[in-house]
Amino acid sequence: MSSAICPCGSGDLLLACCGHYHAGQPAPCAEKLMRSRYSAYVLGLTDYLVQTTLPVQQAALDREAIAQWSAQSTWLGLEVESAEVLGGKPEHAFVTFTARWHDGNGEHSHKERSSFVQNQGHWYFIDSTVPLKAGRNDGCPCGSEQKFKKCCSAYVI
C-alpha cells in the first residue's frame, strides 16, 4: 500500500495524497475532497463516503448500495474539468468531473457538477439525490446558523 499510486489521478502515492484524508485529516479544498471520494469508491471505503457527505444527509444514504456499487465496479479513471470556489461564509464550491468505470453492464462515463460546503474546517459533499428538508427561512442544514435561502439553497443542484 505504501507504494500504491493514488486512484484519484494525481500521480502521487496514495499515502501522500488521498490516504491522508481517508485517515482523518480534513481535505483542504472541495476538489481534494471530491478526488478523495472517488478514491474511496475505488478502495471500497463506504464509511468515508458517508462521513464526507453533508451530516444531515448521512442517515438517508444507502450504505449497502454504495458498498455494492463500489465493489462491483472496475474504476477506470477520474478527470477533473473545473473547481470553482465561490467564497462566502460558509464557503461553497462546485467541482465538475467525469468518472469512468466498468461493471457487468459495460463501460460507463458520468459527468457531474457537484456542490460542496465547508463548515467548521471540514468540506462536505451536498448529495443531490438526498433531499434537504429545509424551507427557505429555516436554518441551513449545513450547520452554518444562517437561513437556508442565504446559504446552501443556491448550491443544491
Curated annotation (Swiss-Prot):
Annotated NCBIfam families: PRK00183.1, PRK01617.1, PRK01752.1
Domain of life: Bacteria
InterPro entries membership: NTF2-like_dom_sf, SEC_C_motif, UPF0225, YchJ-like_M
Name recorded for this polypeptide: UPF0225 protein PSPTO_4127
Biological source species: Pseudomonas syringae pv. tomato (strain ATCC BAA-871 / DC3000)
PANTHER family: ADENYLATE CYCLASE-ASSOCIATED CAP C-TERMINAL DOMAIN-CONTAINING PROTEIN, UPF0225 PROTEIN SCO1677
HAMAP family on file: UPF0225
Protein family: Belongs to the UPF0225 family.
